[in-house]
């Protein structure tokens, strides 16, 4: 999408009027009354009211006066929660294509392909968001009100951004709460520098063409960034320049590490370069919780749980290791919680955003407390992203991201009745 079309899309979204609000002038005021309210940051209110206007929560409590003219939702039998936060998603992200050289002929060609493909620290997710993407609206319909938009590919992948899944009407007011002045979609950028690994990321015969090769490449990239920091006469490198905040400890480094071995490699690299580590796509953590705690590492746990391959015959046997991995995947969050490791959840790899909550429900069925699961979906995620003062709980002055359910959030039969992003209602299909 061109910059002109993106700006036009922002304009059209910003000035659309929600159903039932035509009698009001912006900012629109809503009140959900007589509901069970779960702020996350405090005690549950069994019969309370939450009021929000212009995208910001104005009052939460059991004795709240509803402003005249507010759009009121009767909350009897309903529960209000903070909106869910998905800490690993490509929804709405339209990153530029990874450069590829056709038939590289020389070592120099191969080196250029390798560097251009794998060293993209300067790629900012915030610069490539499409606010009208259907993937964002589908996430919002599933109760996900904010995502950590994460650049894909491998090597030094780029910088993530915390973004809303919809844009409200009062952009100047909401923009005051955000870092990105181009509109109300981006809440905070950058959140982290992301590092990934793969078996053969460079393609063809280019180095690195193995797992150990890409690990060596990542390490060399940080060594190059250190050299760049100290060198006096140096050619400009946008990628190495973008790595400087990470080396200085001002920007966390998010390592994609699913297995215990990968986690330990990531922690070793973080220690060697004095980085502030976050582990993403985590799945096997039982053996490394003490190491995670000692390194003060935060974890973004994958809710893309392994499933039985559809191509297998119903009576086909599977290796014990595969069965064990599938059984243990939903148990990891309880292990992290017991160890006192701060963690949140990500959906990366899930085809349906609704499975994000469904699989979070499975972690509760496998030993994680409801309170811990809710925090991982809301306030812990916001804190991990450096935005705990803006979203993640129902508190006065925070952005009005919330979901309203008929039943307990972790009951698989519960239905989401209302979703508000940036204080505006999301149309549910």
Describe each model-derived feature in a short phrase.
Residues 35, 50, 55, 77, ...:
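Divalent metal-coordination and catalytic microenvironments
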Residues 85-87, 147, 253-255, 277-279, ...:
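Hydrophobic faces of well-ordered beta-strands that scaffold small-molecule active sites
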């Amino acid at each position: 999408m061109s910059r002109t079309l993106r700006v036009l899309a922002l304009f059209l979204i910003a000035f659309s009027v929600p159903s039932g609000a035509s009698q009001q002038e912006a900012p629109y005021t809503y009140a959900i009354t007589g509901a069970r309210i779960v702020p996350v940051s405090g005690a549950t209110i069994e019969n309370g009211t939450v009021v929000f206007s212009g995208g910001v929560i104005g009052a939460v409590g059991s004795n709240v006066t509803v402003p005249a003219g507010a759009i009121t939702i009767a909350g009897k039998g309903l529960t209000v929660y903070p909106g869910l936060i998905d800490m690993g998603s490509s929804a709405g992200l339209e990153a530029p294509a990874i450069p590829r050289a056709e038939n590289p002929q020389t070592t120099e060609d191969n080196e250029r392909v390798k560097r251009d493909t794998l060293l993209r620290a300067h790629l900012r997710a915030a610069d490539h968001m499409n606010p009208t993407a259907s993937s964002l609206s589908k996430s919002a319909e599933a109760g996900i009100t904010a995502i950590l938009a994460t650049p894909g590919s491998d090597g030094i992948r780029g910088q993530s951004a915390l973004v809303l899944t919809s844009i409200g009407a009062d952009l100047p007011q909401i923009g005051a709460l955000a870092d990105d002045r181009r509109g109300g979609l981006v809440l905070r950028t950058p959140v982290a520098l992301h590092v990934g690994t793969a078996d053969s990321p460079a393609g063809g015969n280019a180095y690195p063409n193995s797992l150990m090769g890409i690990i060596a490449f990542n390490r060399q990239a940080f060594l190059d960034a250190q050299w760049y920091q100290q060198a006096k006469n140096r050619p400009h490198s946008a990628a190495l320049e973008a790595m400087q905040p990470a080396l200085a400890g001002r920007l966390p480094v998010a390592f994609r590490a699913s297995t215990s071995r990968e986690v330990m490699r990531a922690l070793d690299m973080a220690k060697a370069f004095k980085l502030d580590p976050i582990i993403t796509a985590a799945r096997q953590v039982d053996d490394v919780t003490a190491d995670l705690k000692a390194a003060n590492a935060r974890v973004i746990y994958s809710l893309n749980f392994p499933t039985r391959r559809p191509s297998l015959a119903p009576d086909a046997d599977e290796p014990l290791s595969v069965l064990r991995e599938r059984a243990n995947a939903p148990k990891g969050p309880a292990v992290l919680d017991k160890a006192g490791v701060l963690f949140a959840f990500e959906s990366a790899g899930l085809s349906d955003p609704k499975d994000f909550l469904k699989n979070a429900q499975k972690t509760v069925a496998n030993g994680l407390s409801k309170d811990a699961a809710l925090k991982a979906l809301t306030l812990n995620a916001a804190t991990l992203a450096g935005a705990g003062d803006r979203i993640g709980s129902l508190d006065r002055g925070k952005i009005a991201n919330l979901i309203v359910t008929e039943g307990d959030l972790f009951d698989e039969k519960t239905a989401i009745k209302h979703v508000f992003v940036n204080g505006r209602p999301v149309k549910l299909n």
